[in-house]
Amino acid sequence: MKNKQTEDFPESFYVMIEIPMGSNCKYEYKEELDNIVLDRVLFTAMTYPANYGFALDTRGKDGDPLDVLVFSSVSINPGIIVRCRAIGVAEMNDEEGEDNKILAVPVDKVDPASSIVRNESDIPEYQKDKLKHFFEHYKELEKGKFMKFHGFKGRDEAVKQLAEARLKQ
């Protein structure tokens, strides 16, 4: 999806939500359909620990827009675009290679609960443990698929990865 990004990118950036927090369905935006489709119902008895989407106007090393996990006080519906700020990176890889996730929160004026979170170190350990557990196990029952979690990096690394992935205008 090619859209205008924020004027202060990568300090703040737009994320299209594909999967709401608490969902057991994996939805994906399909550019050729200009719509969100149901990719699959998760094979495991698990739900997404945060809202999941992608940063508009970016391309990661895998050729897809950068994945973003949006921590918020509410579940956000698929297709909604949220102005966010980066707080860190969850480094991981799957069966196809590097598959990092930018960690973000909505900007403070969108979700006031975000005001206390400035870096990944501000996320409570139990939430980081849930995120790690989810990504290490949600593909277990799917043949040939896996996800390996490597660790968390802070806000500066997230901003760097966003800047490097920005599509040329």
Curated annotation (Swiss-Prot):
Q: Which GO terms describe its molecular function?
A: inorganic diphosphate phosphatase activity; magnesium ion binding
Enzyme class (EC, first level) = hydrolase
- Tell me the residue numbers annotated for binding Mg(2+) 2: 67
Which terms in the GO cellular component ontology are assigned? Answer: cytoplasm
> Could you tell me what reaction this enzyme catalyses?
diphosphate + H2O = 2 phosphate + H(+)
Q: Which InterPro entries match?
A: Pyrophosphatase (IPR008162), Pyrophosphatase_sf (IPR036649)
What cofactor does this protein call for? Mg(2+)
Q: Where does Mg(2+) 1 bind?
A: 62, 67, 99
Name the NCBIfam families on file. PRK01250.1
Protein name per UniProt: Inorganic pyrophosphatase
Q: Which organism is it from?
A: Thermoplasma volcanium (strain ATCC 51530 / DSM 4299 / JCM 9571 / NBRC 15438 / GSS1)
